[in-house]
Amino acid sequence: MNQFQCCICGRNNSEINQAHRELMLCAQCGSNARFRGLMLGVMRYAFNEESKPLIKQSDRRSITAIGISDSEIYAWPLAAKLSYANTYYHTEPQLDICDLRSIDQYSNIDLIICSDVIEHTPLAPRKVLENMRRMLRPGGILILSAPTYHLPETIEWYPDAASLEVKDCGGRHEVRWSDTSGAKHVDFRPCFHGGPGSTLEMRLIAHQDLIQAGMDAGFEVETLEFSPEIGYVWPIVPEYPGIAAPMDGRVLVLRRPHETPVKGRGYPR
């Protein structure tokens, strides 16, 4: 691919750096290939318009949207177009997608964007997806990404963890954890995203497992296929040390179906 037009800011890019979901940076807004895939999903399924970039979309203030620690690269254009709030784990406006009390502060949402979060959650992906489904109105959309792999099954680094603590041992980090049987474990080589001691990787997710988790959580699920013309594309090749399976990482679009209400009870949560 020699060029692309950024679907966020509209910049035509011809000098393209390394093809990777975290690279292929737009020369104007700085978006990477993953961000552009997310916004393609938003424009296709929320705006129903993908022929023009995000910053030139018409205002859709009737659409309520939640970001889960979204990048400012696309958070500010979304805030300018939608009734959108970017939420955070550690600060306001706060949202913990593993905590029902936090989840239940939000309801009847049209659109949720959750990018590269679900590989870090203490709860398994299916449960987290069930929680996000609670937040959506019937017919609502979740735009989801994770660094998924063509593995036969998801690898959980801390299976059945009941407690977990990251310890800084003189510049070297280790994870001390106990499983539900009470057995204690130490991981001397944990993987962090964003630098040592930052965001702990809890699992390597198989792409098909994430699709199945979405369906098991009550969603209709679609893999958003690549669109090279907007810079949403990367090679699906092995890249994880010691893992031969290729990294996929394509964006998923999950729709909460329109359920038939139960008389006297309304829609199921």
Where are these regions (language model features)?
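Conserved N-terminal segment of class I S-adenosyl-L-methionine
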Residues: 1-107, 229-238, 246-251, 257-269
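Short catalytic micro-motifs in class I SAM-dependent methyltransferases
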Residues: 116-120
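A conserved beta-strand element that flanks and buttresses the S-adenosyl-L-methionine
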Residues: 113
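S-adenosyl-L-methionine-dependent methyltransferase catalytic module, highlighting the catalytic core
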Residues: 4, 123-137, 141-268
